[in-house]
């Protein structure tokens, strides 16, 4: 019964894990020769695979230069149900293969020469060489040289060289030796000798390259003064023994470094293999194409294992597909396999194996080798980021690095976001691949530049490193280095004096300082009259006084200046013997003129005198500056939501007790306050060490949580870089206030006297000069931020205007309208009451006398605004009718009293 139950459980688990995923994966193989080293490497790589699914090869031996045969074999394997095909091609067959792969969605993995294609279903294992070749030519400062090439490899490298030659004014003589005979070689080199061409680039495959070098030796063109650059990735695959004694200089590239740990281990396993197919391999010089073949098999294995873990159904059911169907029917699961292949990344025989979105190798390193009469030596390396790095840099970085490269170093670090973090699916990885973060990538770059293998180990106590005051023992990462448990510390480890006494630091890879983290306060709501905020209260008061003062001055100068008074124009029929002088700038008109100018609206009157115009001009200039300044500030004040921070600096913290503040329990920040002699920091340290409950926290995460839960009653002191990172993480409720309290840096630490000190130091300087350190910080701080482009980094956030921002403007409008209605009502009542009183006292005058008085009266020439109103006008004159003297003595009786009234009673 137990056996049945166990069998059932095993079957159920297998069905869950590998649901819809085949246990056996058919892969194709197209090889030009069954006895080739590449074929042996292919079979050996398959024999080393242990994890499911199992790769079953379908191998065909084919003439890779025959398009018809290649088409037949390709379609045959596709019809048999292969999931991917590994093989070689030549110039005559590459277009056919890429066309079929793109149409059918079948992935083709090849170690052949790279081609410029946008077909992502062709995975090119061989790195591109053109950029590295140009870097070497530029390093040697060649201006005139010969480029010998084989057209069978394509023309991409030659085209790149010619394009660069046009930019840099190089003189390049290109020679195609595809069909060159032995006599042709002789004539070629004789012609080059006549032209004194002794700088030559040879771009050929290894077999043809050996033949060309043989002709060079035979024609004795390998003496002193000749310099050959071999545009080939297998410098060690070529027989150069006869060049050692000749004096010629030969430079080339080596993709595989068989002295590295991984290649040496794999090569030893291959050499010791008992498989019969491997016995004919030349173990002294395995070719780089064989290493590419081995890595190609591993690429396929890694991709299918990834698909199996993700439970992606790629099984081929029913008809396997017709290769020659018209129109071609693409394989539905092909795109999933293509994506999985491009996402593979591992350290293989050829170094870092990684592909870009076009299926080409990326992030690879080429070793630059040179052979002179004194032997073969490495003169540097080339990669996509650094370009060519001469070996002189390596020598300065610690002399001979062979001792560095012959062991695996322990790199201690600490789990701290975003420096070192466990991946979400860390249980699916092993070793260094389980981690990600700024320091993880930095450690990889340092190891690549120095040239050593390493293993990341998280410090057991989770501390950076401090000395116990009682036992004098070091803990944390510093203790790991001091007591020999680690070789390097790559972490946010602050460079301090006490640490520098026991360990060595590199140059800082990041500059920072102690900063203050608080909980982000609530945004303050704008006041009703927030539109007045752009100018201070004192300025508004000064503007009011200036307005009144200008109006009074304008009134006075208008009264004193004779040019401000003017006569009214006479109307036709008016007696011109009388002359009325008027002045438009009474006190009310002066106030109205000043208000109109300040509001930039103007009015109907303007000063006539020079003094009045001076007053108006300076007032206009004053209002121009004030209004412009107000408008400039108004946009910022109305569209920015402001947060009122309870503290803005360390001084604010020190002089209050309501908000508690603390640091990490063991770290450089605590040591800074403990050792500081600055009064403010001494006061803060006195508070922190005596505060109850304790204000110190064990981890940065604990401090962050305490800030968030304290409701603004706790401030955490930490490095500015970590503060900025936390500010960018959800729930985006913390913020950095004030400037940094000090200035320091993070460094890579090594034990005292370590051989890694100088190499690591120079590597950090190089990464800084290349801008890689800034790129890494932007990647892990801001590109991966969760608080938007503004993030928590800004205390002010631009937003649209709300009604509360401009409510005061509407209140003033409503108030002004109400006041106008009230004043109009008062004016109406006052006028009605005045008219009523006047009418009651009006005397009765005979109609004939009144008519005669009206006919004989003299009217002013220009009634104007003041004349039409009667009584005293704004212009300072009195307008009245001039009745004849005969009418002035007419007696009249009041209706009320019957008393006689004179003309003056009117």
Curated annotation (Swiss-Prot):
Keywords: Cell membrane, Cell projection, Disease variant, Disulfide bond, Endoplasmic reticulum, Endosome, Glycoprotein, Intellectual disability, Ion channel, Ion transport, Ligand-gated ion channel, Lipoprotein, Membrane, Palmitate, Phosphoprotein, Postsynaptic cell membrane, Receptor, Signal, Synapse, Transmembrane, Transmembrane helix, Transport. SUPFAM superfamilies: Periplasmic binding protein-like I, Periplasmic binding protein-like II, Voltage-gated potassium channels. A lipid is attached at residues 603, 829 (S-palmitoyl cysteine). L-glutamate binds at residues 492, 494, 499, 668-669, 719. Residues 861-880 are annotated as: Disordered. Changing residue 627 to T: In MRD67; decreased AMPA glutamate receptor activity; no effect on localization to the cell membrane. This is Glutamate receptor 1. The gene is GRIA1.
